């Protein structure tokens, strides 16, 4: 029987560099801020930036108007519900065109046309 040789593998030490966030500059307080973010993960720095963006508020406005429109239709307030939905859909179309999200704008246009045809045929 052949002699079995043992292979010794040296331990590999891989150091992963600490990633500094781009929101804090190197200062005495940066470690303290990093610790605070770690201890309080409810609102991260990315979430703070998202909330401050104009797109966030436009998308939230579209969402709120369309939900209120849907609730109005669900509870039988048809005219107000349809008008709220129409406003929301129009804002969506314009917003998606501005953001160059053409498939979504086309989808909203098709929804607008089919809904208007449905309202016309059922009134």
From Swiss-Prot:
What is the annotated localization of this protein? Answer: Membrane
The portions of this protein that span the membrane are 67-87, 104-121
Chief place of localization: membrane
> What are the protein's UniProt keywords?
Membrane, Transmembrane, Transmembrane helix
**What topology in the membrane does the UniProt record assign?**
Multi-pass membrane protein
Example GO molecular function: nicotinamide riboside transmembrane transporter activity
**One GO cellular component, as annotated:** membrane
Q: What is this protein called?
A: Transmembrane protein 049L
């Amino acid at each position: 029987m052949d002699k079995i040789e043992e292979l010794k593998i040296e331990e590999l030490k891989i150091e992963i560099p600490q990633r500094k966030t781009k929101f804090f500059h190197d200062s005495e307080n940066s470690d303290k801020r990093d610790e605070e973010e770690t201890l309080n993960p409810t609102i991260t720095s990315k979430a703070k930036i998202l909330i401050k963006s104009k797109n966030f508020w436009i998308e939230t406005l579209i969402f709120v108007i369309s939900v209120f429109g849907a609730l109005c239709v669900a509870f039988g307030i048809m005219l107000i519900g349809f008008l709220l939905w129409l406003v929301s859909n129009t804002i969506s179309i314009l917003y998606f065109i501005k953001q160059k999200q053409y498939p979504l704008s086309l989808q909203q246009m098709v929804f607008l046309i089919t809904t208007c045809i449905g309202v016309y045929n059922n009134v």
